[in-house]
Amino acid sequence: MGNHALLSASSSHRWLNCPPSARLGENYEDKGSDFAAEGTDAHSLCEHKLKTALGIPSEDPTENLSWYNEEMEECASGYATYVLELLAEAKKVTTDPIVLIEQRLDYSKYVESGFGTGDCVLIADGTLNIVDYKHGKGVEVSADHNPQMMLYALGALEIFDALYDIDTVTMTIYQPRRSNVSTYTVSTAELLEWAETVLKPTAELAFKGEGEFHCGEWCQFCKAKADCRERARANLALAAYDFAEPPLLTDEEVEEVLAKVDDLVSWANDIKEYALQAAISGKAWNGWKVGEGRSNRKYTDERLVAAAVIAAGHDPYEQKLLGITEMQKTLGKVKFDEILGRFITKPQGKPTLVPMSDKRPAMNTAKNDFMEENIDE
């Protein structure tokens, strides 16, 4: 993957909304995560699968992938198949489409020292298609006005626009673990206008560490999220509602709290984790100490435990059906659907409040049920 730029495409959603956060994050250690490591492995496998499918020599990375499993294999194969489908469509309009894999894309014309890596770049008949693989399953990622994808597209235009006279840019997110394929298409002219009027001036502020701090859902990916003063100010302002009983709040106030309460909870948890790690490292917080958390009993040696129980005349094991996820990993998705598809059902989920922008359909509430019953009568 290489080194990341200060104003990387992957972090652009954050620094475009909060320009000073880019420089602020330089003061913090760059800690990796299991999710990032898993994503890196998945990208390596995707690259290999796609190269192999295109007849490009590639060394199988599987034995060196710490997070490799059956699911990752299926996801990477699906990604390669999807790109081949795009290529087949491209060949209907041009005889020689261009396919580039893990292409370095330089967008420094608009962003100081800006560069990134495009998973797949496809060019055919005046159309540029950027495909980005996402292995995460926590948050569904949309390609619509996605700044990371738009930066990649700008980098690709710098290389190929003069050669191929590109007038249309399509950006695609392929996120198999969320069954999500999101596509956004924009004219080259519109993309370049955004680059000049929005991206370039904001990037200049971000590179200098200037501009205004702004809190939002992008804070979750900021290194300074735990002790950022602006985030604290915004969340403490919301916490003031705690001094009034909920029945005394107006509907508008409740709606305002609902829109921000997840950020408040996230911020509070970030503060607790930051303070704990600092205390473990030796920092003293007035009125606080590091205590031992709850723990559960465990066997020191399961093999010896089993032998002892068997010797006492008892069976130490339970026979239990594999869960759906483990069963699918064991059988593989195709066989799982073929053998067990008719035995699988998904009950209705527990009601939860979500914004109207959420893609899930609204559930029937007691009021809706009552209204429907009256209509039927």
Regions found by a protein language model. Give the residues of each.
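Mg2+/Mn2+-dependent nuclease catalytic core
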Residues: 95-204
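Short amphipathic alpha-helical segments and their helix-coil junctions
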Residues: 17-30, 130, 138, 200-207, ...
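Hydrophobic/aromatic-lined pockets within catalytic cores
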Residues: 50-54, 135-138, 153-161, 204-207, ...
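Metal-dependent nuclease catalytic cores that hydrolyze phosphodiester bonds in DNA/RNA
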Residues: 1-128, 168-170, 182, 261
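Alpha-helix N-cap/helix-initiation motif
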Residues: 31, 35, 140-142, 250
